[in-house]
Amino acid sequence: MSTSSRRRRSPLELSSSRSSSSSSSSYASWASTTSPSTSTSTPPSLSRTTTVSTSHVFLFLLAFRLLNALSLRTFFQPDEFFQSLEPAWQTAFGETHGANGDTICGLPSILCYLLQFILSPTLPRALFVSPPHSAILSAIGDLYTWKLARYVYGRRSHEAWAALALTVLSPWQWFCSTRTLSNCLETTITIVALNLWPWEWSSESTPTVQPRRNTRSTTRDTGLDNTGDGAVVVRLRKCLTLAALACILRPTNILIWMGLAGVAWFRSAWRERTILCREVLLCGVSVLTGSVVLDRLYYGLWTFPPLKFLYFNIAQSLAVYYGRNDWHYYATQGYPLLLTTALPFTLVGLYRTLSQSQSTINTRNVSVQTQLAAICLLMPLVLSLISHKEVRFIYPLLPSLHVLTAPPLVDFFLPAVSRSNGAYMPRRLSLVFLLLVNITVAIYTSVYHASGTLNVLSYLRDQQQAHTTVDKSAYSPGSSQRITAGFLMPCHSTPWRSHLVDPNIHAWALSCEPPVDLTEPQKAVYVDEADQFYNDPSQFLRENMVGGLRHLPRKPSYLASSKSLEASPQAYQQATPHEWPDYLIFFAQLEPTLHSFLRSSSYGECWRTWNTAWHDDSRRRGDIIVWCLDPTEQAAWRSATRKRTLEHRDHQFDRIVETLRKNAPAEILPLDSMDILSVRAIGLLNLVLVLALGTTQTVLVRNPVTSLEEVLMDPSDMDLAKIFQEEN
């Protein structure tokens, strides 16, 4: 059920099936007979590069993705927690510990079984377990993207290195590839399987499968260059096994393999068709049987999660409950988000590939490009028929898109970087600009955008730790105090128990359970708890909180004389009506509303963190604010806020003084200490007037570094006002 635990397993399987030495030589024979892509106009002298060891490339990618995984500080999709880490936490520690996993659709239970041996109740290791394994999976995906490009364009072609550069410098890859999403694992499995697919079957220039001669010698060689019957069957078997795993994980992945299998069926001989059908049945039934058995062991009953996936999203149309998108979403938003600055080159690559003449399509490399382009169009086209769309649904296509993007990228930038001709300067500047844009987008989305949803959970852990280590309460001496938290946010706005970790943190959040098994009339009027709150916050708080808006607690539960909470985290989370918590967490958009309802209560701001500069959901805009009942914490936060404000103002004054020193006439320099004090006094006076009058037009000083006698409010002199505006 946990994506991160599946990630723990897959690298071992993949690395055991193909060692780095065999991988580096797997393309040698085929590449020696294949020229670079005919779709590129790169001169032959520029189409070759030096050979680099595959193991060295993988080590670089592994280090790069490990840095990538450890640098993630932001929230992307609830599924990266509620369909991976949360179910794993529940499996490891039991339902009573408050994990809130999404088990409606279910993922193969082997994921949770693997992860439960990693998690530890003593330390928040769950926060550090997934990055290394996610980095390994992402690095494998990058490596096999490069390998597929080498297969298509030649081992030493610039196009292969361009494909590697595209995947390494992709903002989407940096933002998404190391997350605990099932789509990330699906993408890695898909690109590895594409490397094992018998592309030669759909190319008329490739000899058909020959009768088996020496099974022992050929079955051990799984390289793509070997056309022996035994080697092709072994390679196909591995490919279909991985493809079946990807389809079990995400049933929509079958669209990729239906397209490739259809082309192979129509363009291959009957013997190859027989082999294909036999292996599809063999691998499909084997993987399906294993999945059903594992699910039976985990759930305790016979179930088939992929069927539930289709029933949930297609038959009951419950996917629409989580959002409805335009039919052109994947064309106008999906591809631009996946490709960012590479989108123009991708469009050129797709056009070139699909406009190839019939005579060139039969060649091996062009045939592979054509099939990759076909599946890159087929999958979004079919998924566009479903109302609910997300860019991550087409994420498995990104490696193939990078392979197709490489030739136009090389054609455009290679002459600019390999020649010193000044005529190529605009292209060089364009390359630098695109790199800067990619780096900026990657850093912002992975470090800053939606970072508050993770930071607030760290704050709650710190508060619980503080109450545990400094416990002076007379009501429970020698024991750790339990704190309570309530999240007045849209559902699944933050991770849950996998990040709260401490079972002494009791928390509840607004829910949004889908209307499963309801009739159509019932679905039409169904409103979940989160929507009920945002539709009418006042009524919701009166009817769904203990005591309503009239009887609110005056001090936190850990300072109250009543007995500490005896209920489990799960029971506290599911209790209705909700208890007023020690800590109330919400987005800044809701602050004015709560101020009007709770202004006479003991709640006050005790922490705030930056979350986003913008958000497509208006309910999630602004900072994340924490109100608490503890007056000591409120006073400490006010004191810290004032201190930061004063430090910021002092810094502003220093900048103003420095600016005045630089702009002052030479005959009155250097300034003595009295001049500096005069300027600082003037700056303070100006700031007070700005805050009081709300305008800078009256905050003016003529030649402030001359003497205090000329400190005048002259509306005609705008010098200092302009400086003040520029500095702020």
Curated annotation (Swiss-Prot):
The keyword Ion transport does not apply. Keywords: Endoplasmic reticulum, Glycoprotein, Glycosyltransferase, GPI-anchor biosynthesis, Membrane, Transferase, Transmembrane, Transmembrane helix. It comes from the Eukaryota. One of its GO terms (molecular function) is alpha-1,2-mannosyltransferase activity. Its EC number is 2.4.1.-. It is a multi-pass membrane protein. It is an enzyme of class 2 (transferase). It is found in: Endoplasmic reticulum membrane. GO terms for cellular component: endoplasmic reticulum membrane. Residues 1-46 are annotated as: Disordered. GO terms for biological process: GPI anchor biosynthetic process. Pathway: Glycolipid biosynthesis; glycosylphosphatidylinositol-anchor biosynthesis. Residues 12-46 have a biased composition (Low complexity). The chain crosses the membrane at residues 52-72, 246-266, 274-294, 330-350, 366-386, 393-413, 429-449. PANTHER family: GLYCOSYLTRANSFERASE, GPI MANNOSYLTRANSFERASE 3. Belongs to the glycosyltransferase 22 family. PIGB subfamily. This is GPI mannosyltransferase 3. It comes from Aspergillus oryzae (strain ATCC 42149 / RIB 40) (Yellow koji mold). The gene is gpi10.
